[in-house]
Amino acid sequence: MNRNRFIYFTDLMLVPVFILSFYTGVELHIAGQGVDHESWHIWAIFHTNASLLFMILGIIHVKSHWAWYKGLKTVGCKGKRKAVLLLSIVFLLAVVSGILLVCFVDGANSSLGLWHYRIGIFAVSYTHLTLP
C-alpha cells in the first residue's frame, strides 16, 4: 500500500473508530450510574480498547499531517485552521485524561472520569459544529 492510500485509509478509519469510542464512553458513563459493576467493567474494557485504537490512528494521522501543524507557524491560525487546531487540543486532552484514568484511577465515578466524559462530550459537540 502506498503512502497516500495508507493516509487515506487511516483518516477514513478515524470516523467509525471515534464513533465507537464515543458510544462506548457514553455506555460506560451510564453503566457507572448503576449498581451492576460487571456491566461497568465490560464497558470499561470495550471503551479502553476502542479508545486505544482511536489513539493509535490519531497518532498516525497527526504524524502524517505534521507538515500542516508545522506550517501553522508561518501561515497563521485563522478560520478552519484555528478550528482544527482547537479540535486537536481537545482530543489531546481527552487522550491524556484517559491515560491518567487507566493508570491512576480504580473504579467508577471518579472526578477525573467525569472530566474525561465532559471533554468527550465537548469534542463531539465541537466536531459537529465546526467541521463539514
Predicted features and spans:
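Membrane-embedded alpha-helical bundles that constitute the cytochrome b-like, heme-associated redox core
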Residues: M1-L129
